[in-house]
């Protein structure tokens, strides 16, 4: 909805222009709320290390996560209801938005004891959920939300036996054929680490694999079975997926071959030519990502003692949001790393706050 008018004016460039304006505005808001003036050079370096320019220019959902969190942080100085509404609109870009709004509300209550931030988080959760329901009803009324299908697909991509067991239990021939297809796909070495084999099955089924029926009748039994049928290997895979986000390999989600049709110009783009899947590009991204980790760790080591209690609580909150983000997507999807990458700018926030020393503490505005 936010892109409708800009898209009519400037076409494709509407997304990077709008995202850039939001991200820049979020940084400015952070400086005003915490009354800091960081070095422009240091700030630019941190922004590059956090891979923020890539996602701001190319991915709507992950670019909006950053300004949404800063808006919620600013609720101590700004009207909490309006802040919550704006943050909720941004977080509604992904189904996990309401979860993280609630996570923020809990952290605000525990760490900051800030009623205003709690209210902002709760309002954001309601708005994000409401917008998702509204958009689904307007745009895809016949398609289920697949809230159970995605985690079910994640577990049977790791353990194809789960899909086979559900096919045997239900007597569903399509599921039986899908189980055979998953087992076949996993025999290829390049698919060993994939957690999204569901889409391969769906594409090759030529419409026989009914998403609505799978969501309603089969996804939940598969999830329940996952906790009973060899849960230890599954738990180990989830834990290793969590650790892989911090490992030396970087996997972007800019796939060269997409399932949905795109304008003709896409097929002449760097993405379609496999630029983002090239080893040199992924290696540079890994170096930058580790630079972001090291900058945050160094700022934490040298700046922790000379910052005020409020900033320390903010840093702890940022760390917990980052862990919650990675834990959620290790559980639900696993690699690629784009969902981990969206917490890198939060580490850049923490670094800026720590190196800014004893910044002026934001005073909560009267209710």
Where are these regions (language model features)?
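Membrane-interface anchor segments at the N-terminal boundary of transmembrane helices
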Residues: 9-18, 237-318, 322
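Loop-to-helix entry region of an early transmembrane alpha helix in multi-pass inner-membrane enzymes
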Residues: 1-25
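Perimembrane helix-loop-helix junctions
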Residues: 100-129, 349
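Membrane-proximal stem/loop segments at transmembrane-domain junctions that anchor or position
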Residues: 142-265
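Transmembrane-helix signature of polytopic, membrane-embedded enzymes
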Residues: 30-50, 63-67, 80-82
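Multi-pass, polyprenyl lipid-linked donor-dependent membrane glycosyltransferases
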Residues: 15-21, 44-71, 89-103, 339-344
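Membrane-interface alpha helices of multi-pass inner-membrane proteins
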Residues: 80-94, 124-130
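Membrane-interface transmembrane helices that cradle and orient dolichyl/undecaprenyl
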Residues: 72-82, 110
């Amino acid at each position: 909805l936010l892109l409708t008018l800009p898209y009519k004016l400037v076409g494709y460039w509407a997304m990077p222009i709008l995202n850039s304006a939001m991200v820049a505005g979020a940084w400015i808001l952070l400086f005003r709320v915490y009354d800091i003036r960081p070095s422009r050079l240091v700030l630019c370096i941190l922004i590059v290390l956090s891979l923020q320019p890539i996602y701001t220019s190319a991915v709507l959902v992950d670019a909006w996560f950053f300004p949404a969190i800063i808006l919620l942080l600013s609720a101590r100085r700004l009207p909490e209801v309006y802040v919550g509404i704006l943050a909720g609109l941004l977080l509604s870009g992904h189904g996990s938005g309401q979860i993280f709004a609630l996570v923020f509300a809990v952290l605000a209550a525990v760490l900051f004891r800030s009623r205003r931030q709690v209210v902002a988080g709760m309002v954001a959760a309601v708005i994000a959920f409401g917008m998702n329901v509204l958009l689904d009803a307007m745009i895809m009324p016949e398609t289920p939300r697949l809230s159970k299908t995605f985690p079910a697909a994640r577990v049977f991509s790791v353990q194809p036996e789960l899909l086979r067991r559900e096919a045997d239990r239900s007597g569903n021939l399509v599921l039986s054929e899908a189980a055979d297809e998953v087992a076949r796909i996993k025999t290829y070495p390049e698919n060993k680490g994939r957690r999204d084999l569901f889409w391969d099955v769906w594409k090759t089924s030529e419409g026989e694999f009914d998403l609505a029926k799978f969501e309603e009748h089969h996804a939940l039994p598969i999830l329940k079975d996952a906790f009973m049928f060899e849960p230890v290997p599954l738990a180990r895979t989830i834990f290793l997926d969590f650790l892989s986000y911090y490992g030396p390999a970087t996997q972007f989600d800019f796939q060269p071959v997409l399932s949905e049709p795109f304008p003709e110009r896409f097929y002449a783009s760097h993405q379609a030519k496999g630029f983002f899947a090239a080893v040199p590009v992924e290696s540079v991204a890994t170096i930058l990502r580790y630079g972001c980790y090291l900058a945050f760790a160094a700022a934490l080591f040298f700046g922790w003692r000379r910052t005020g209690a409020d900033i320390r609580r903010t840093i702890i909150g940022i760390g917990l949001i980052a862990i919650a983000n990675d834990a959620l997507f290790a559980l639900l999807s696993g690699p690629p790393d784009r969902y981990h990458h969206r917490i890198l700018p939060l580490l850049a926030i923490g670094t800026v706050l720590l190196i800014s020393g004893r910044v002026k503490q934001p005073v909560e505005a009267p209710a």
